[in-house]
């Protein structure tokens, strides 16, 4: 797929992406690499200059209506999607739009708000919430219809450590409960490590690497060349002479403890 803007700028330059049903794919790349443009094509918001897009068995743009009924999305700027007077109305909005009776939609919205631990926000205006609260409300609206495909565009951008950790935990749990396919974009290698079953690295609108998180995210040279920051524990272990450092932080800790133990035994 290729997408060129009217001035000739190539935002996506021959990029190919295949996602299996039920898979969690993280598209990893620096700002300006084409991640959001790619998602806009999957959502039918843009039409490619060249190439073909097929989502959930439907060719776009012809099947865009059917596709959108089966997709949940959290945009990078969630203010663009939180449009109703209250949180409860916002979460119920997509359900009502899909034809669910209003009372049933509000009941389902309350269930998902409670599931995410934000039921106390249901009467609050979304525009007055914190950044982390807004992301959770947007996530509630995205998963309330139990989508086949969940799309998350830079979902932890601007969140502090605690909010990021909560968001990641909830995504993992919801994925397990609902079984949706997931495509997530980010520049944060740690988020990719936490949520990806497969990682696709893009730079300047092109795929530069694809594979398991263990293979991709521990390749320090690849990550740096792609304009990204490698996981700190991976960098540390590489400096200590470990050629193939583990991606899992617990395994890294065990390895460091073992190395320190060997060093202490060798230096009584």
Curated annotation (Swiss-Prot):
Lineage top rank: taxon: Archaea
Annotated Gene Ontology cellular component terms: ATP-binding cassette (ABC) transporter complex
Subcellular location(s) per record: Cell membrane
Domain ABC transporter, first and last residues per copy: 1-229
UniProt keyword annotations, A-Z: ATP-binding, Cell membrane, Membrane, Nucleotide-binding, Translocase, Transport
CDD domains assigned: ABC_cobalt_CbiO_domain1 (cd03225)
Membrane association type: Peripheral membrane protein
Pfam families cross-referenced by the UniProt entry: ABC_tran
GO-annotated molecular function: ATP binding; ATP hydrolysis activity; ATPase-coupled transmembrane transporter activity
Binding site for ATP: 29-36
InterPro entries given in the database record: AAA+_ATPase, ABC_transporter-like_ATP-bd, ABC_transporter-like_CS, ABC_transpr_CbiO/EcfA_su, ECF_ABC_transporter_ATP-bd, P-loop_NTPase
Enzyme Commission number: 7.-.-.-
Main location per the UniProt record: membrane
Family: Belongs to the ABC transporter superfamily.
Role this protein plays: Probably part of an ABC transporter complex. Responsible for energy coupling to the transport system.
Protein name per Swiss-Prot or TrEMBL: Putative ABC transporter ATP-binding protein MK0182
Organism per entry: Methanopyrus kandleri (strain AV19 / DSM 6324 / JCM 9639 / NBRC 100938)
């Amino acid at each position: 797929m290729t997408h060129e803007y009217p001035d000739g700028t190539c935002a996506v330059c021959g990029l190919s992406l295949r996602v299996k049903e039920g898979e969690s794919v993280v598209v990893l790349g620096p700002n300006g690499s084409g991640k959001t443009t790619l998602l806009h094509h999957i959502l039918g918001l843009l039409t490619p200059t060249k190439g073909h897009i097929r989502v959930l068995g439907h060719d776009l743009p012809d099947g865009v209506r059917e596709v959108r009924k089966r997709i949940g999305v959290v945009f990078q700027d969630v203010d663009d999607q939180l449009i109703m007077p209250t949180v409860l109305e916002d979460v119920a909005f997509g359900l009502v739009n899909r034809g669910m009776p209003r009372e049933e939609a509000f009941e389902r919205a309350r269930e998902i708000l409670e599931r995410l631990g934000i039921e106390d926000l249901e009467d609050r205006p979304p525009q007055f919430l914190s950044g982390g609260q807004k992301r959770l409300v947007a996530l509630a609206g995205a998963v309330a219809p139990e989508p086949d495909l969940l799309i998350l565009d830079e979902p932890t951008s601007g969140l502090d450590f605690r909010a990021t950790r909560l968001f990641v935990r909830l995504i993992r749990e919801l994925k397990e409960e609902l079984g949706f396919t997931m495509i997530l974009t980010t520049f944060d290698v740690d988020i990719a490590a936490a949520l990806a079953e497969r990682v696709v690295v893009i730079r300047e609108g092109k795929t530069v690497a694809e594979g398991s998180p263990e293979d991709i995210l521990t390749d320090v040279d690849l990550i740096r060349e792609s304009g990204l920051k490698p996981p700190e524990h991976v960098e540390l272990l590489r400096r200590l002479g470990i050629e193939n450092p583990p991606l899992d932080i617990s395994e890294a800790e065990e390895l460091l403890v073992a190395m320190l133990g060997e060093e202490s035994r060798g230096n009584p």
